């Protein structure tokens, strides 16, 4: 049968497919505009070295919060509040974001961002402490969405706890699931890669979860719970 693929598109040329995939991701990453409040929070994140999700990742978090009808969300890694602002924008008006960070200064700056956005104090619960300890104190099946943006080495523990927290119909999202492509490199054997792969395995082997790996930011591993 004659192929209808255009030159360099589809299943023909692996190099062309790779270029096309890169162009699509680049387009997606630059297709989202942020308002002045989120942009200011992003600048503060740079100033304090906190890191922040890309606008495209933020927009996806907003969409997932809307799709799950999220009233209760847990975020591991407050940073300067960029991802929190995106999550809050998609949550229900009576929703509460619980956000955890070991750095009190990060949370102080995030609180400023939330205030600038007009987010009432009753809609956020900022917990300063080690997420490894804080998560264990949160109630089972009490959250609609769990977002993990933390050190790759801690992903397996956070995934285990995050899935425990999810209500049926909820979703878990893990950022930094690709490690710049290293997670998919069969020759990469370092401890970070091993931890990220273990987190992915835990999600893949849980029959209650339907996972997908999304090529935005540094890779998002998302899963919906039945």
UniProtKB/Swiss-Prot annotation:
<dbReference type="InterPro" id="IPR002935">
    <property type="entry name" value="SAM_O-MeTrfase"/>
</dbReference>
<keyword id="KW-0808">Transferase</keyword>
<dbReference type="GO" id="GO:0008171">
    <property type="term" value="F:O-methyltransferase activity"/>
</dbReference>
<dbReference type="InterPro" id="IPR029063">
    <property type="entry name" value="SAM-dependent_MTases_sf"/>
</dbReference>
<feature type="binding site">
    <location>
        <position position="149"/>
    </location>
    <ligand>
        <name>substrate</name>
    </ligand>
</feature>
<dbReference type="InterPro" id="IPR050362">
    <property type="entry name" value="Cation-dep_OMT"/>
</dbReference>
<feature type="binding site">
    <location>
        <position position="101"/>
    </location>
    <ligand>
        <name>S-adenosyl-L-methionine</name>
    </ligand>
</feature>
<keyword id="KW-0949">S-adenosyl-L-methionine</keyword>
<feature type="binding site">
    <location>
        <position position="83"/>
    </location>
    <ligand>
        <name>S-adenosyl-L-methionine</name>
    </ligand>
</feature>
<feature type="binding site">
    <location>
        <begin position="77"/>
        <end position="78"/>
    </location>
    <ligand>
        <name>S-adenosyl-L-methionine</name>
    </ligand>
</feature>
<comment type="similarity">
    <text>Belongs to the class I-like SAM-binding methyltransferase superfamily. Cation-dependent O-methyltransferase family.</text>
</comment>
<dbReference type="GO" id="GO:0032259">
    <property type="term" value="P:methylation"/>
</dbReference>
<keyword id="KW-0489">Methyltransferase</keyword>
<protein>
    <recommendedName>
        <fullName>Putative O-methyltransferase Mvan_4497</fullName>
        <ecNumber>2.1.1.-</ecNumber>
    </recommendedName>
</protein>
<dbReference type="Pfam" id="PF01596">
    <property type="entry name" value="Methyltransf_3"/>
</dbReference>
<feature type="binding site">
    <location>
        <position position="53"/>
    </location>
    <ligand>
        <name>S-adenosyl-L-methionine</name>
    </ligand>
</feature>
<dbReference type="GO" id="GO:0008757">
    <property type="term" value="F:S-adenosylmethionine-dependent methyltransferase activity"/>
</dbReference>
<feature type="binding site">
    <location>
        <position position="75"/>
    </location>
    <ligand>
        <name>S-adenosyl-L-methionine</name>
    </ligand>
</feature>
<feature type="binding site">
    <location>
        <position position="102"/>
    </location>
    <ligand>
        <name>S-adenosyl-L-methionine</name>
    </ligand>
</feature>
